[in-house]
Amino acid sequence: MARILTPVDACAIVQAMVEEMTGQSGSIQTVDSSNFVSVGESILRSGPENTINTLSLVLGRSFMAVRAYEAKLMILNSINSGLYANRIRKISYYSRPAQSSGAFNTTDNTGSTLYTNHAMGYDNGANGGASLPTMWEQNAPVPMEFNFGGRSVWDDSTTIYEDQLQVAFRSPEDFAAFVNGIMVEKGNDIESQKEAFNRMTLLNYMAGIYDLNAVNGAAIDMTAAYNADRGTSYTTTQILGTPAYLKDFVEFFVYTVKVLSNELTHRSIKYHWSPTKTIGGVNYELLRHTPKDKQKLILYKPFWIRAEATVMPEIFNPQYLKIENFEGVDYWQNENAPMAIDVTPSIPDTSDPTAQIAGSNVALDNVLGVLYDEDAIMVDYQLDSSYSTPVEARKRYRNIWWHFAKNAINDFTENGILLYMG
C-alpha cells in the first residue's frame, strides 16, 4: 500500500526493532516496513511507558547502574522540515540528448544527406524538414518530481513519585542521584528508539535495492562475483570458514569497493532506478553521479575488523572515501543473526512512478554492506519536544512526556549498491 500523508502510529514496529536490537527477540523476525518508509517515505514510532511500581528502602549507599547510550547509525543524512510540513518535494531533471547541427549541411555515416541548412532560397526551417528548425526551437528541461510524504509519530513518558522517593532515600543527594538515574535511563530508551528508526530506514533501503535489482542492477552477490573473478566455485560458508579463502576474498572485496566507488562518480544510468519519461516519441533517462565526498559506506563491522589492516589504507584516503563517511555495524537487524536481514520493503511501483507499493520479502543471511549517495537515505526530523506536568496534588507525582514525529526517506533514484554473499 502507499504511504499516506496522515500521521501513522509507528509504535509497534519501533518496539519490535528495539527488541531485536537488544536481543530480546531470540531470532530474526520478518519486519514489514511497507508503510514505514516514504519512497520517498519511512518512519517509526515507539514508546514504552515505564512506571515505578515498587521501591525498596535502602540501608546503605545506592549505586545507580546507569550510563548514557548514544544511538548508532547517525551517519544517515538528516533534514528538518519542521512540524508544519509533512511533505518534501524533490525535483530532478532528465538527461537530454545532443541535437543535430544547424551550422553545416550534414550527412549520416552512409553519406546520405541528413539536413541541408545552407542552400539558395532556403529560409529558417520552413523547408519541409530538409533543414533544421529555427533558433527558436524549444528544448525545455524535462523534470521529474517526487513527493516524500507522511509522518510517523510516537510519545514516551516517565513518572516521578516525589514524596515516596524522598522517603525512600536518606538525603537530597541520594534522591537527586536516583532521579538522575531515571532520566538517564529514559534518555537511553529514547536513543534506542532513535537507533531503531534509523536502522529500519536503512534496512528498508537495503532490501529495496535487492528487490529492485532487475531495474537497477545494484545488488551484487560478492560470492558469485569472487568465484567468477577467480575461476572458483566456493560457497559462502567455505569462504568465511577457511582463512586462506577469506584472506583472498577480503582483497577482492576491497578492490571491488574501490572500483564501485570510482564508478559512482561517473554520470550514468547504473546503480539506481531511472523511471523513463517519453515525450514526443523520445525517451529520457535520469542520470546520476555521486562525488567521493557524497558517498557513504556502511559495513558489517566484524568483517571489516578482519579486513581492517587492508581496508583502512586502501579505501579510506583523500582519493577514495573519507573516513567520516563510514560506519560499521555489529549487526543489521538482530544481534542473534548479525549478518542477516529479513524485510518486506516499501518500494516505488516501477510500472507507475507516482505510486508506492509493498515489495517482495527479502531474506538474506550474509549482508556485507551498502555503498550509497547521501541523498538516498534521509531522516526528516519534524518534531522532537518534551513537556512536564505539574505535580499531581493528591498523589504527589509528575509525568514528563516526549513527543516525536519523523519521516524516513528512501530515494531509489539516487545511487546505491548492496553488497551481500549469496
Where are the model-predicted features located?
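Intrinsically disordered or highly flexible coil/loop and linker segments, enriched in small
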Residues: 68, 188-199, 266, 409, ...
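Long, contiguous amphipathic alpha-helices that act as assembly "spine/axial" helices in icosahedral shell
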Residues: 143-216, 396-402
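Alpha-helix boundary/N-cap detector
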Residues: 5-12, 43-46, 50, 54, ...
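Extended, compositionally biased alpha-helical segments that mediate assembly or anchoring
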Residues: 1-70, 309-422
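Assembly/oligomerization interface modules of large self-assembling protein complexes
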Residues: 52-158
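Extended oligomerization regions of viral-like shell subunits
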Residues: 235-373
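Loop-centered beta-sheet repeat module
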Residues: 185, 196-255
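Mature, Sec-exported extracytoplasmic domains of Gram-positive
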Residues: 28-42, 46-47, 121-131, 219-225, ...
